[in-house]
Amino acid sequence: MKNTIIKGLTDLVEQKRDNLIRQVVVQLEAQGYKAVLEQATVQQFCRQFALSPVEFALRCLPVAACYALTPISQFNVGAIAIGQSGSFYFGANQEFVAASMQQTVHAEQSAISHAWLAGEKAIAHMVVNYTPCGHCRQFMNELNSAERLKIHLPHSQNNLLHNYLPDAFGPKDLNIQNVFFDGQSHPFNYQGHDPLIRAAVEAASQSYAPYSQAFSGVALQLGELIICGRYAENAAFNPTFLPLQSALNYQRLQGLIDVKVSRVVMAEAKADLTSLPMTQSLAGAHLGLDIEYISL
């Protein structure tokens, strides 16, 4: 079966007949379909086409939407998180057959988690092809850049996040000072030699769980590669992003959807709640695998 991302990008180039889109797709192909444009590449495109970074990102939204996985809704949403570094991190919505609707990844979550795992320190702009839903507005309010974050839509640009979420409730209301995208370090010890377990423990140590202390991470084995995901809590609790979604999203945006996952390890700190049941459910439904669980 043909890679659905490659097929979507190929079809987009043929349908749009847009030189900018064609060149962006060529760039993605050259980097193995990793859905990121580094700052230097962004600057090069902006100079070539006489566009601002936000204008360029708006033109790239159909490309980002090609990374969507929407077997249920058939409604593809693309998002681009522009980091303070100037790099573009693409994201897209993802739905999982035979799993609950609550397991869905929203495009804004996708782009933000992508940037976080890539080491970005703050998000300056969110560019998305449809108005953010309430869930995503609350998710973005957890960011260390929430007060100055700008939202850009095809029909409306330069809107502060808090214009979409007035009188917002967030981490500061719960006396949390070190927020999402601020450095996280919660060292957990693992004395074994299994690199996949070690990677899951390291992901847990960098996760964001100020409300429950249920720090967790997931590591996926893809041939010789390891892909990790991190847990990220939210002041409103429900918009919390689970570590397996984070890992599957990163796998997709690294252009690795054709590489089979053979193992899933989850490492989680002991706390009053756990993400294990939902993680087990999604791993079984989407990957046909059991979770190897490490209690920290």
From Swiss-Prot:
Binding residues annotated for Zn(2+), in chain numbering: 106, 133, 136
Bound cofactor: record note: Binds 1 zinc ion.
Residues holding substrate: 93-95
GO molecular function, one term: identical protein binding
Catalyzed reactions per annotation: cytidine + H2O + H(+) = uridine + NH4(+); 2'-deoxycytidine + H2O + H(+) = 2'-deoxyuridine + NH4(+)
Keywords tagged on the record: Hydrolase, Metal-binding, Zinc
Top-level taxon in the UniProt lineage: Bacteria
Enzyme Commission number(s) from the entry: 3.5.4.5
Keyword Zinc part of the UniProt annotation: yes
Active site, UniProt feature: 108 (proton donor)
GO biological process, one term: cytidine deamination
Names of required cofactors: Zn(2+)
Record's subunit section: Homodimer.
NCBIfam families on file: PRK09027.1
Protein function: This enzyme scavenges exogenous and endogenous cytidine and 2'-deoxycytidine for UMP synthesis.
Protein name: Cytidine deaminase
Organism for this UniProt entry: Mannheimia succiniciproducens (strain KCTC 0769BP / MBEL55E)
Gene: cdd
